[in-house]
Amino acid sequence: QKPRRIPVLSVSSIIKKPTWLSDEEYGAILDGTYKNRGRGMTDLRYGIEINTAVFTKAHVNGFFTEYGQGLVGHENDFEGSVKGVAESGGLSVINHPGDWLESYVDVNHAHEKKNIELFADILKKYPSCLGIEAFNRIDTVTCADRILWDELLSAVIPSGRNVWGFANSDAHVLSDIDTSFMDFVLPDRTEQTVRRGMENGTFFSVGRRAVYELGKDFVGEGEYPTVTRITANEDEQSISIEGKNYNRVQWISNGKIIAEGEKIDLIAASQNIGCYVRAQLLGKGGICLTQAFVLDDGNMHEVTLRNITPQQRKIELAEDKFKSTRFYVLGQEISREIAYRKRRRQEKKK
């Protein structure tokens, strides 16, 4: 039986014809005789990308909820989807924020306090919004999303919660599969166990490509770097990593590499450490990110990103509302396309 499609996808299928499973393939999946890769698979029901059919790519992933199915999105509106998922009892993740920020064009967009504040406020307000994608597909439009993640960690952790970094192949086509994914550490593969793993951050995010960390021409192949053990030594004030398929380990805090090697001495590195540290393992197969380890010396305090008056904020909200109208956004997209084509022509002339 062919799946029910909402009208927008029905139109898109005219442009790009879908490839259906044959009756034999579908039957083999149902009776368990389909080709076996030797690994199990967990079907996470009720997962969907929300706030779609928008030009601005303000997408949110909803998990363990039916909220958002068939709903037409609103331009530049992350919070509406996050709120809807929260009220339905599900979990959410902010998708490819760099695609919305266009930080792949200008990395400074990932450092702008207004942009950081927007996502930080959502994360503080909705605990069910677990974090952002640190990797998406082949890391083109999301190459600065680790930079934004570090900014958010510094802004949000002092408020009392962590921000998980996710990875997603966003597989619209077969070639996207295995480009970005998460490596979970779980006692079993039940739906509820996966949910707890997402909530607790018991997973590592892997990317086959990482433009800033590995170079724009690098493509990971073969076995990817993985973490097999993490040891936090309270007496030594150190964290050590064990793993496989890597040739370098880097430690990051406040968006900067502060140490290298399988072990970090937190006291020796204290001058460069903020409220967290995270590790990344690099190898021939790509890059593997740990979640952030929160470091609290007792002096942690809430972060205020911008000091603006209520009147300034009111004006800003009115401007943002206007910039989220379809009329404005359509004009913006046309201008961006013209600028993009101009850049391409200039690059070809060089």
Regions found by a protein language model. Name each.
Residues 85-87, 123-128, 270-273:
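Flexible, charged surface loops at secondary-structure boundaries
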